[in-house]
């Protein structure tokens, strides 16, 4: 915990709320949580891994906004039990609950042991429906473009600099007085953005697709919370098999060329070709350097080049895929991030579901080695898994 006086050079006019208002009369409530999420950049949200915490809750309605700090390391914090009791009442209302990147906040709300009633609106998802060609979907960018409002970050960044912390990932280390105004502003902007998006939904006749995405959301949330079951013993066995395969193929190469090449370095494979009197490989147009594609190595008549390709496959599966899987396993499960639509953290323009942390689209196909990797994913007890392949075509103009 950072030890530092609260009375530094940076001043704040934010005042901590002195009451818990009854919001039951409001039809729309905007919510933004500030969190301590230490592994966010490397493993995704910590909400499913029993680390981190919600440090503050910002709520906004038509004529009021407030930020309730409960776990800032530098304080001051309000009574956690009282705040969560009030927040629970807010969530139990039938009003629309409006978020930007809703699944992130909803996961942390679940972590608090609270339940959300009413329809959940995600302005980041709506932004993608309104304009799928945007480059950025973060709250600041979208709000600036649609309502001319942006985050109030100047005081926060100045305070973070004085305290020697990252203004985003280490916000929880700052005193609440430097975060309160920023957090309230986020909730207010999200609410205002939703008012503008309602106009866009009407003008573009997007009601059906917006409603569809809202209906899908609870299922995606449950999928994220439940996670995918992993057989960790099988993962270790597959990892060992891949290592043995890699060693076997590299030994074969060494026996034929008398050295271990760097299988991902074209210059090193070129030396193998020199030893084997192979000259039919391509060179890049710009630099003239050798190029060794997977297709070239896999289908070459020379067994050494085919062995290099096989070694590459084993190496990639082990170091790129399995190591990534191991990094995300928690209590025998992987809780990958699921993306409904294109957004700042991943996703596709077409609306096809995609994953990150880890990227489950990287699961190998139905080769022998690929099926070995797929075997680490196991169904729930009493459930059978059916493997289906859907043939489809994406038409472009």
Regions found by a protein language model. Name each.
Residues 115-132, 138-141:
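Conserved beta-strand -> loop -> alpha-helix junction used to position metal-binding or nucleic-acid-contacting
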């Amino acid at each position: 915990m950072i030890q530092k006086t609260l009375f530094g050079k940076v001043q704040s006019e934010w005042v901590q709320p002195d009451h818990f208002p009854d919001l039951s009369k409001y039809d729309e409530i905007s919510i933004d949580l500030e969190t301590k999420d230490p592994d966010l950049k490397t493993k995704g949200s910590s909400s499913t891994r029993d680390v981190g915490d919600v440090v503050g809750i910002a709520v906004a309605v038509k004529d009021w906004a407030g930020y309730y700090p409960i776990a800032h390391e530098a304080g001051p914090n309000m009574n956690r039990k009282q705040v969560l009791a009030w927040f629970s009442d807010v969530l139990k209302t039938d009003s629309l609950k409006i978020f930007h990147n809703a699944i992130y906040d909803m996961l942390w709300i679940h972590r608090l042991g609270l339940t959300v009633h009413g329809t959940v609106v995600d302005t980041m998802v709506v932004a993608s429906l309104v304009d799928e060609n945007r480059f950025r979907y973060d709250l600041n960018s979208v709000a600036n473009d649609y309502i001319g409002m942006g985050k109030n970050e100047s005081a926060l960044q100045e305070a973070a600099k004085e305290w020697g912390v990252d203004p985003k990932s280490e916000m929880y280390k700052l005193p609440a007085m430097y975060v309160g105004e920023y957090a309230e502003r986020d909730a207010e902007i999200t609410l205002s953005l939703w008012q503008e998006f309602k106009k866009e939904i009407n003008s573009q006749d997007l009601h059906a697709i917006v409603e569809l995405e809202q209906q899908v959301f609870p299922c995606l949330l449950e999928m994220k919370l439940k996670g995918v079951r992993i057989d960790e013993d099988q993962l270790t066995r597959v990892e060992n098999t891949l290592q043995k395969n890699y060693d076997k193929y590299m030994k074969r190469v060494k026996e034929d060329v008398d050295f271990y090449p760097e299988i991902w370095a074209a210059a090193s494979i070129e030396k193998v070709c020199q030893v084997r009197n192979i000259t039919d490989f391509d060179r890049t147009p710009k630099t003239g350097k050798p190029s060794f594609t997977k297709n070239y190595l896999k289908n070459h008549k020379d067994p050494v080049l085919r062995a290099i390709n096989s070694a590459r496959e084993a190496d990639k599966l082990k170091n790129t895929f399995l190591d990534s899987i191991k990094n995300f396993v928690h209590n025998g499960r992987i809780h990958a991030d699921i993306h409904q639509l294109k957004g700042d953290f991943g996703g596709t323009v077409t609306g096809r579901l995609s994953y990150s942390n880890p990227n489950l689209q990287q699961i190998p196909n139905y080769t022998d080695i690929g099926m070995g990797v797929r075997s680490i994913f196991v169904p729930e007890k009493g459930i059978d898994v059916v493997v289906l392949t859907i043939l489809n075509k994406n038409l472009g103009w």
